[in-house]
Amino acid sequence: MTIKRNGYNEYISMSSNSSPLLLYDIISLTNGSNDNEIIINFRSHVLNSNIIELLSGAAPHYFDVRNILVRNMESQKIGASFTINSITFVSEYMQYFVLNGNENLPNVYIDERGVVAYRKVWRRFTLGSPMFVFDYDGKLVKFTIAVERAKEGITVSSILHTRVRILDANSEDDIAFISEAIVTMMIYYKNSELEISQYYAENLYDELPRVRVLRDSKRIRNKTARRIRTTSINDIRTVIPVNNYARQCNRLPMLVDSIDDVPTELRGNTIKFPLHGEGGIDKPKYVYCRYSDAPYPGMMVNNLAGASKKFPYLPCCYKTSQEVKDVNLAYSRDVMPEVSSVAPNRVQIYFNTQRLLPCNSFGRSPMCIEKFITGINYFDDRLHDDDDNDSVSEYYPTISKVTDDVNASTYYCIRGGVQKGPNSIIEAVLRSLQYLDGRDPRTLSITDSILNSERLKLRDCINVSAQELYDIPFDKRLDILSSTQTYLDGFRFVKALQYQYDVNIYIYSRNCGPVTRFIYNHNEISLKFEDNDNINKQQQQQRERNDDDDDDDDSTLVLPYHNKSSAYIDTKIHRKSIVIYIHHGTEATTNATGYPHVEYIMFRKHKKVVEKLWDVYKAMLPVNITNVYGLSYYEADNDDINETISKRVAENCRKKLYVSTGKLLKLVGENNDGDDDDSFIPKLQVLDRLGKCVQLDEYRISSLSDFIEPLPLPIVNENMFYNNPSCLTQCYGFDAAFKVDRLSRLLLYITLYEMTLTGSITSVYFTINRQRFSELICDSGCVGKLLNNGCVTLQKYTHHLVSRTTTTTTTISPSISQEDHENNIDDSNITYILVDSSDTAKRLKYNATLLIKRMTAKEIDNLKLSTHVLPLLRYERDFALSNTSHDNMVVVTSMDKFTTKSFDHRYIYKIPSTIIPNIGESLVLITNESKEQTELVTVTSIENFTRIHDHYENSDAIQFKCVVNVWSGASTWKKSV
């Protein structure tokens, strides 16, 4: 015997021949009793009985384990519950066994008061589970027995056992004695069960059993039926017995026999039903509605299973009159029409939340889209033309179902649900195209095999997504598309989808970012998404730019994935446009797979919205000036390529290629660019490292800052993607695998020098020097080549040119004459840079900072030897060039270094503007060579500096070696000894 404790319960297991015989589970005990005494009492009662003989004799296979639960009852009574494993019974057989009696049985009776009862559901007499009474020395103890399924912990097993409940015993001794007697009775019953069953089969069974027998299970208690009214005013369900009627019609009408039974104020809105003898009802009755918000009765097609043949049409209550509806007109005919000939009712399945929608259902669109519609005066009458997609009215949710009292824009844009899976974006595009064609997108049948087939077709046009896949090798791109169970990222493959389905795609996203890494592990591809903190920061900045104070909705219009240091080209030239929505849903409906889900957005007036959406999208695209300074490299074995084409011709070539493949472009027919004589249909293309097209066949696009989108053509230099794809902004030096043409290299080095040496720039203070511009034109012929090739005009170039001069500054007009180019002067102290705005200057500084941080020591040494590069600032480390004419230059990187360094009159000290505490004030260091002292002068304007300069220059007492840097951005002044 072992005693074990489990939580708050104790139980005893007694074994014989390694087989458990008895198991007691004691829950509660009588007052003042000792646990050990009770256990011993139970043990003595049970082991002294004849149960062991029964187990080894008559029916040893019927009884294995017995569980007893003892509990306190009211009025000093004790109850118990235990199970008899492997023994089941039939209630009718057990009652027969007890009523006929047996000499070996204890005094057991049946309390017949609750056995026989009349039940309205069955409308016949049945036998219920009886209450048994045990007569023990004149004491009547009630108990019940029932068949149950065994439980293993919290799991319900398929094994059946008998549950015995003793209800009102007087003591523990009574429970022990009665439980022993009941077990003995059950063993005798099991030996007699087959004989009783044969008796029932011979005497009580014919075609239908006279006694309802439920073997080895509890009886199911049925609910009583609804009381049938006997008055003339009836609930319609009492006359039309259709299950789940209220699920299709939530406003059930009333049905009366006579018009006199209809309330006087409602007699004007009644219909007759049934008109064609449905359900065996020959005389039509009157239907009316008693709802103030739905007073009009009307007919609807019965879509409920089980009664649609008997009642093809059912009445319901509506908010508006239904007299002219197709269903009512068809039902009122002399002959009842077929249901298939009547337009089906529009089922209003609409979700007013941001959860993931079930397939073929509609829901509320993101709040930012609703605000966008309101902001473009969508509700203006001029925007409600009839030339838009009016066929949407056949399936679009009604305004009463969608619109709330606060924001009516919810009616004019809704969200459509698709199947959950890795290819949800393909299904969203297909259903959007179905909607643009004037058909219900929910009627489109889409399976996984169809989606996988459509995904594999994208491999033929994968090159159009080169901008979004710039950091992925070419062969890996095809592997991603071939793996149909890998999530298809809309941020990465949107251009391929646009070309494949000939449609422009705008992306709205909520707390979702692109896939930043594809991890290849044998045949599986793992995904790593952009950090959510970075996504939330970007979307918060986007909302601030849009003056959106709503924090409840984080969805924004986003650009596809691309290199942030370069421009992104997306012209949206297709005639059709759709909007998709990428999100994770709410916490209750988050996609269990871990990747985002894609749905589509529909508009009541689609054309009007996408036209305005294109204007917003264009403003989000980075400007082309970043292409010059964005470190966009491409292979160029020969810098001097004579065969070039302009960007306009290259775009026309792209359009002609699209038209030749059957694409419908929105620009064709609106201008003559598509019919340019110089355009041709290209067969090959050359891309730079960031995925932009720089060459078609043998023709190089001449402009440095204007590229075009990649085309669905083979790539000549596709191997370039295998070399160092992670270091896209690294400066490769002079021995790099990817060569940069001379002019791009020159502009890069000039930018690098200017931004790292002087800090930030405020372009409004810069002036253009005519002589310095002329010298730049003549320098190695680079700028001359730029002008001669037609990349930029002279006027445009001079507008973007900024020159740092020596003693004087002059401003020239853009219309500079050619003879000014021929003036050559010594420009050893000149620096220059191309900028168009202060924002561009900030981008240049950022790119140059990234460039320097990624450079190696060897690359820095090469840059020092370059004729185009002067001192560079690296990690706030002071260094000077020994191989240039400016070997007396020292760079000061902080105000502390400036004030604490021991000044030497042989050096010129430069202070980066970022350390100046007040942008309106600048510092000038004046070195007094004779007295070996320095002086700091505050300069607030150019005029103020001029007066200071003249004062020191005309003074005989003080000679100065140099005056360095007016950091307000006017110019650099210098006076040599």
UniProtKB/Swiss-Prot annotation:
- Transmembrane segments annotated in the record for this chain: none
Q: Where is this region: Disordered?
A: 531-556
Q: Could you confirm whether the keyword Phosphoprotein appears in this record? A: no
Q: Domain of life of the organism in this record?
A: Viruses
**Pfam families per record:** DUF5757
Q: Which UniProt keywords apply?
A: Virion
Q: Where in the cell is it found?
A: Virion
Q: Which GO terms describe its cellular component?
A: virion component
Q: Which family does it belong to?
A: Belongs to the ascovirus HvAV ORF146 family.
Q: What is this protein called?
A: Structural protein ORF43
What organism does the record attribute this protein to? Trichoplusia ni ascovirus 2c
